[in-house]
């Protein structure tokens, strides 16, 4: 199976909703319809870089209703998490893609783990306006400054 090969090679690990103990009630109810209705030809691309121990930029801004591709690149020497549980609850997710290696189509995520020298692309439509915390859940990384904010306007 292609997705198993990706995980086995250490290219990408996704923490999916059901493994985190969350329920679908917490997430955008009509996510599939919102993704389908979006005009992906107008998609905006936003880049964020992960390094020891930061997100650059540390504040990400998105407009509700606009389709996005968030390119998450780990230019560090350690693996890092892009953990933004409340943000993931506020968006309609289309898919996560790992370079040319494959993609995972799942409606719900709580975190993305990106290995050194690798990248992930998150395709989504922001829905619920607000300010959401972002941090790396690896012990000590947030304390060293690996935190940020995601705003949906």
Regions found by a protein language model. Give the residues of each.
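Bacterial N-terminal signal peptides that target proteins for export
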Residues: 1-11
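A eukaryote-biased signal for short, well-structured alpha-helical docking elements
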Residues: 24-41
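C-terminal motif of bacterial Sec signal peptides marking the signal peptidase cleavage site
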Residues: 18-21
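Beta-strand cores of secreted/periplasmic/IMS beta-sandwich domains, seen most often
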Residues: 58-83, 119-128, 152
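N-terminal edge beta-strand
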Residues: 38-67
